[in-house]
Amino acid sequence: MGILARDGCELTPRAEEAEVLVVNTCSFIEAAQKESVDAILEMAEHKKFGAAKKLIVAGCLVERYREQILEQVPEVDAVVGTGEVERILEAVHGDLRMLPAEPPTFLYHDFTPRMVTTPKHTAYIKIAEGCDHPCTFCIIPELRGKFRSRRFESVVREAENLAAAGAREITLIGQDTTSYGEDLGLRDGLAQLLAKLAQVRDLLWVRFLYAYPNRITQELLDTIAAHPRLANYIDMPLQHASRKVLARMKRGANGDAFLDLLERMRKTIPGVSLRTSFIVGFPGETEADFRELCDFVKAAKLDWMGVFEYSDVDHAKSYALDEKVDAETIADRRDRLMALQKRISKESLRAKYRRVKNETFLALVEGPSKENPMVWEARLEGMAPEIDGKLYLTDIELPGGDVAEAGDAVRVEITKSEAYDLIGRAVEILPRPAERAVANVPFIAAVPAEGKPHRIATGAPLRVLG
């Protein structure tokens, strides 16, 4: 979207207004693939009966089904794969039907035009692209290519620019953030990067997601513990705890090894919040394997957890494995595991944030709740944006009359804990950073908190649905 906006396109969320429709697709799992296909067909109808003159399909689905998309949906005018992102303008302005396929080697940098689709106080930075791990359930290497890290200085510059534009929190992402820098010859590259980002002024927290268990080093843990701006938070997808299932996944390790790692994390970083995700119903997973996973979850006492139902992806190696688990059993196991974690998360929140007289916690204010505008949402250090629980503030006005705003850092008292969320009230608003000029950024545009893009009025005649 940033490339299009810099070129003078006016972005709109309304398909009926657009002259060019761009569908960015995902095909990582079956559900995402179906959603992408549905979106393409819906936009094809808009093109037939609306103002749109062109329909472009971009993203992961193109990497797998480039020719099929063009053959089966004649309304599609061009396809742009993950290796051709910077050629989106050729697709928009040209009359070519298919760009020549290129290997997925694209890696954006701090000068790449970018539209920030989060509220300005929180932002994501992708520090790497692709993956070299051989997980049998995953097709990321096919879709995104080999692992490649962004240059150290490029990531730091982007963080500095986002902070100058009002970001109080940076979340680092990548298919495997903990491998950052290995291809650049950096030892403990993520630890080095975090230490540098911890010096960026005006940031409240820096966190990272998608850590790979065997890449968690003691140096990384020590770095998190040493810098107050580095959130005491680690997201580490484990996928399972049964040695047999993990071996079939080509993940390695086992539940006991994971428990040892979790103990080391908690010892090094007191109060650390831990998140993971699991896959249930992987081919060959027996009831005994599932019970082993449940026993692990009970012992691990993780703060947050996501559970995914296994689904076959035709290009994944697991597609050819025998002993498939039926859909009903998979859904039942997901429900049972989530019910177990719900009790654990509730106990974890209660223990970490139990009501203690005069004790306060640092929180980042998000804004009014969608469910109830009279209540405001915030997050604590141990809550990552979009995926974890929330802190609901029943009162954002202080006795002196000051009122907290979205993006404010506040001290809060916790009054109640629920299964995944907390309730509290603001008692102090921390000083707000002074506004600063943003340098060396070709395009940064914020969109509303609900995540829908603004129509960007540039005076250009072309409207693009993003």
What are these regions (language model features)?
Residues A58, I173-Q175, L209-A211, P237-Q239, ...:
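Generic beta-strand/beta-sheet core signal
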Residues A320-G466:
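Terminal RNA-binding accessory module
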Residues K54, E169, W205-R207, Y233-D235, ...:
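Residues at or immediately flanking beta-strands
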Residues M1-Y180, E219, I224, L230, ...:
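Proteins enriched for Cys/Gly/acidic motifs involved in redox and nucleic-acid/cofactor modification
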Residues S27-A32, A167-Q192, K196, V200, ...:
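Conserved glycine-rich "GG(E/T)P / GGGxP" loop and the immediately following alpha-helix
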Residues A164, A191, K196-V200, W205, ...:
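Radical SAM/AdoMet-radical enzyme domain recognition
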